[in-house]
Amino acid sequence: MFSLDFCLAKKQSIKREDCFDRCFPPAHGTILDEKLVSHHPSCYNSLERESGKFGGKQMKQSFRWRYFFQQVLLILSACALFLLNARSISTVKVLPLSALALFFWTKYDHRLIEWRPRFWAWNLFFILSALGICLAPMSIFLSAFADSKIIVVLQNLSGIEANLLVRVICAILVAAAMWFAFCAVRYFYALLLPVATDIAADFHAIELWTLAGVSAILMIAVAVLYLHTNAFAHPWLECDLLYSSDSGACIKYLSYFRIGGVENDIRSPLFALFTAPFLSIPYLLSLLLPVANAQAMVLTMAQVPIHVLTWYLFIKMIPNCSINQRLSLLVLALASYSGFLFAFFPEQYIIAVFWVALFLYRLIQHNRREDFLVVGAAGTMITSAAFAFITERQDEKPRLGSTIKTILLTGLKGVGALFAFGCLDVLLSYQHVAHLFTYTNVSGSFMQKLMQYSAHVSSTLFAANAGPIVMTSEINEWKDIALGSMVWHEYPVTVISIAGVIIFSLALIGFLLNRKQILSKASLFWVIFSFAVICLFGWGTSENGMFLYTKYFGWAFFILLVLLVQKVLTWLHLEKYAAPVYLAAGVGLFLYNLPQIKALLDFALTYYPA
């Protein structure tokens, strides 16, 4: 998707056989395969010089016209999918721009059209994923366009009843969109699989089985909880029911799949693009379950392995840790209030932090700065674009011009994805940006923001100071929580959190003692960034919603604290006791947080039974 070097291989010195292997697996034909030749110009050029069987320019022109036809077919299918995901009729205005961008994208990277998996079973997976992506926006499309002016005009021309007409149009668009959705999912995994394969090679079988077991336990817990309460993703109380989470809106408005979803604004411009391939099949499964909140339950269950793996990727980057120590640290991370509770929330931050973890792991462990992962992190949460300034480790200090060029190219690829994959609705929702500034508090009291920040830092490990309150005013954005509704919110912060100050101070000490490690530098960078976002810009302070950001920023504090403990144990020559120390800390932390967890669950079961 973002490796233009691959597409311009003819400018590189590569062997014909290497080019073939990178374009297509060996199972897909001989060296004279027409698909191979049309896929990559350099393959054709090298073969043309060595064989007289091609018929010269005529054959080359034939391949080019064939590929052009495939481009046009893909663009038409893409337009159908973009219309299905449209926020409004005005989306039609930007379709030509998306079509043009997609044309140039496929011109320079043929994999979107012609990449093939090694095993046929992958195609079934891609088809089911594409089906889920195309079916997900149907309900919103039907309700949004039933009374639109275009439908009225078409109804007058055809004489068909409006609801039936909308359903027919929707069915046609779904069928037409399947090809692009299939190619896009296939392309997504073509980019992700090499990264995933390299990362999986670093894992021991014990680690993989443990991650699977922990995920299974938490998924069962999610299923049991959602069968008894709908508080974690309420069907009509869309936001701020538990803390300041918009979990209900994420489910109701299909933020995981709809490119033009209401939650996928400038904050998360490419969120659906980097999430739908993971959750589209679980969405299909949810349609088969005879449970009222099946969609929320299944999608939350599907997020659990991502949540667990994200934590373990951060832990695995910590140097000089044995398997037992890493697994003990996983227990500690999931025993924290944030780590445990976010396993039960369908939240965008879970996906956003996953892409951050992938990027940092690839960079730190493999010294590979993948633009695909940078755009994934920034596209799912725009503030993660700050990681674009991190470059690969080099023997010589990189030149400033080279660094700037790398950053600009990454940004250009992100903007290209925004245009080519139908996410221009983000730009059309500029009026919503003004509303987002209501969540900031730049001119507010710095001391008040500092107190809230200290509470935020404390909540990364310990239970937030929260409880049931009665809503006394409507929510500005959604206006869906009625006056008098019981919600679970953080109490106003009136003092500096001592626990937050201690955690912040220990994190700084952890950095100072490990300042040469790139993981330590990245973690400190994120800690400083969190301070700037909350204390300077005041993001989230106006609604006192600090707990929600513990998932996004909490991992940096966790890593720095572990690095500090690791250093202290080394000084005391107690490294062999690290695993029991982490495990005991995890058990103690969970027991400390248990009363608050129990109180929250009692609230959910009492006021919002399923």
Describe each model-derived feature in a short phrase.
Residues 314-335, 521:
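Transmembrane-helix signature of polytopic, membrane-embedded enzymes
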Residues 82-83, 368-397, 402-410, 584-585:
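Membrane-interface alpha helices of multi-pass inner-membrane proteins
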Residues 301-321, 509:
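Transmembrane-helix motifs of polytopic, lipid-linked glycan transferases
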Residues 219-230, 405-499:
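Membrane-lumen/periplasm interface segments of specific transmembrane helices
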Residues 344-350:
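Short acidic/glycine- and proline-prone juxtamembrane loop motifs at membrane-interface regions
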Residues 339, 351-368, 556, 560:
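Specific aromatic-rich, kink-prone transmembrane helix
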Residues 261-297:
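Short hydrophobic/aromatic helix or loop-helix immediately within or flanking a transmembrane segment
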Residues 103-106, 191-193, 312-315, 473-517:
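Hydrophobic, aromatic-rich transmembrane alpha-helices
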